[in-house]
Amino acid sequence: MSMQTAPIKKTTLNHLQAKKNQEKIIAITAYDALFAQIFDPLVDVILVGDSLNMSFFNQNDTLSASVEMMLYHTKAVCAGAKTPFIITDMPFGSYKDEKTALKNAIRVYKETQASAIKLEGGKEKAKLVKTLTDEGVIVVGHIGLMPQFVRLDGGYKIKGKNEEQQKKLLEDALSLEEAGVGLLVLEGITTPIAQKITQKIKIPTIGIGSGKDCDGQILVWSDMLGFFDSFKPKFVREYLKGKELVQNAIKQYADDVKKGNFPNELESYH
C-alpha cells in the first residue's frame, strides 16, 4: 500500500484575519523561486513587490515596473513557495481605471497562483476595490508612504506627522476596509496613528516603517539580509551581512581557481 503525504496547507485570508490581535503576521518580499522556497516554511505572507524594480533591476523607483514583469516574477515565486499567502503588487498605471484594473487583476489570477493583488491609494480607491472584490479578487490595500506616488510627493516622506495627515490616513483605512480590502499595508506612518488605525479597523494591518503595533511586519528581503549597503532606511534591521558573505565566498572560489585548487580530484570525472 502506498503512503500518501499530507496535503500542504495553504495560508488563506481567513487564516491571516484570524491572527488579528492574536499573533503577529510575518511577511517578506520575494522575486524568484529559489528564495521563495527558502522563505516558505518561515513566513505567513510573501509579497511579490514592485520593489523588485529597485532591488532586482537597479532602477531608482518602482514606476517602470510592468504587468508582464510582475506576472513573470509571481509565477517564479509561486513555483517555489507552496504554503504562504502570496500577494502580487499591481504596478504603476495598471489600475488607472476599473476596466484596466479588472483586466490586469484577472490576468494575475488566471496566469499565476497568487492569492491576492495589492494596490496603493486611499479612499479614492474604495470604489475600485469594491469592483475588484465583487469579481472575486482579494485586494490588499496600501496607504501612507506610497512608492508609486514618490514623484508627486517629491520623495519618500513619512506620513502622519500632523493632524490633517492623521485624519486622512484614518479615513482612508476605514473607507478601504468598508470597500472590502482583506489586509492593509501601512508604510512610513508615524507610530501613534498606525496604532490607532490598527485598533480601529477589524482587518489586519501589516507595517513597514510604521512601528511595532501593527498586526504584522514586512521587509524587503535584500534589505534585511544586508545585500544593500549604499542606503538603509531607518526602519530596516539587518539580520545578516549578506553582501559581505557572498563576496567572501566568491573571492575564495576565485582564489581556488587561480591557484589550481579547484576542481580537485574528488570534484573531477575519470
Swiss-Prot record:
Binding positions for Mg(2+) per the UniProt entry: 50, 89, 120
Q: Lineage, please?
A: Bacteria, Pseudomonadati, Campylobacterota, Epsilonproteobacteria, Campylobacterales
Biological role stated in the UniProt entry: Catalyzes the reversible reaction in which hydroxymethyl group from 5,10-methylenetetrahydrofolate is transferred onto alpha-ketoisovalerate to form ketopantoate.
Quote the InterPro entries the UniProt record gives.
Answer: Pantoate_hydroxy_MeTrfase, Pyrv/PenolPyrv_kinase-like_dom, Pyrv_kinase-like_dom_sf
Catalytic activity annotated for this protein?
3-methyl-2-oxobutanoate + (6R)-5,10-methylene-5,6,7,8-tetrahydrofolate + H2O = 2-dehydropantoate + (6S)-5,6,7,8-tetrahydrofolate
Family, similarity comment = Belongs to the PanB family.
How cofactor binds (record note)? Binds 1 Mg(2+) ion per subunit.
List, from the UniProt record, the residues annotated as the active site of this protein. 187
Q: How does it assemble?
A: Homodecamer; pentamer of dimers.
Q: Which residues are listed for 3-methyl-2-oxobutanoate binding in this entry?
A: 50-51, 89, 118
Its EC top class is: transferase
Instruction: Report the cofactors.
Output: Mg(2+)
Gene Ontology process terms (BP):
pantothenate biosynthetic process
The alphabetical list of record keywords is: Cytoplasm, Magnesium, Metal-binding, Pantothenate biosynthesis, Transferase
Protein known as: 3-methyl-2-oxobutanoate hydroxymethyltransferase
Q: Is Cytoplasm given among the entry's keywords?
A: yes
Give the record's pathway: Cofactor biosynthesis; (R)-pantothenate biosynthesis; (R)-pantoate from 3-methyl-2-oxobutanoate: step 1/2
